[in-house]
């Protein structure tokens, strides 16, 4: 496995290498533009400034990064609201300590210029969803816009059925399927970002063990501080340093897709939401998502959802 190591050049830092913490961060997918802030923090030396030597562990379809967290093989894992609630539901000792995406990049897409410009226009239309989509956000969209399960068709990560049917809708990820469809079919789909329609899940959360939270809160503070610096730099300055490191770990990632992802995160305020501090979370937001999940039957019984997160570090 390729390792990205923060290398120190100053004599002061070199003299204090013994004080550095070796930290592993596992990703929720293969390295991509949505992870750019963490890579920017490596490239710009922000982790090094906080005495952290960071190794990034790629995720992917055959990589169980949550198992790595549970086995104490990594200090931090990237997750989301649902995963943290599942920890709380099962009384597992893992907790979300920050959220670097105020908005989940999950989208539904429609064709342009066909009158499907808002989720309220979805009635009676074919909707291509994966099993994940059915289990995670479908109930929310269905209830809010009075849709029906009869509209659903399976989405198996092949967009051709959607491309062929101008009256259909398909799920996607903000920087992935819209980009691929534009390249394959020559049109930019209409993007309906679920977060902009009230779906309140956090994404790119940082998960840590309760043991680490109790025994080494200083490490968490330093890691999150450096990560915030990386995200601020990535969004506001030249992202190329992050792109270069992402492509070292994921050589199959095209440069134009990285540029597209970066621009869409800024356009849709994925990281900053409505002006929230980068990485921050709120108790009200967690409560809202939990209560919505219970109402939709995702959880068959109530539990202490506050165990899913801590605001000790994020705000």
Task: Name these PLM-found stretches.
Residues 14-15:
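N-terminal signal peptide c-region/cleavage motif recognized by signal peptidases
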Residues 22-155, 159-164, 168-175, 200:
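Short, glycine-/small- and polar/acidic-enriched structural segments
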Residues 1-11:
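Sec-dependent signal peptide recognition
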Residues 289-291, 295-315:
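Hinge/cleft segment of the Venus flytrap/periplasmic-binding protein
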Residues 82-83, 157-252:
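Pocket-lining segment of extracytoplasmic ligand-binding domains
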Residues 215-298:
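Secondary-structure end/capping motifs
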Residues 20-21, 313:
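Bacterial Sec-exported substrate-binding components of ABC uptake systems
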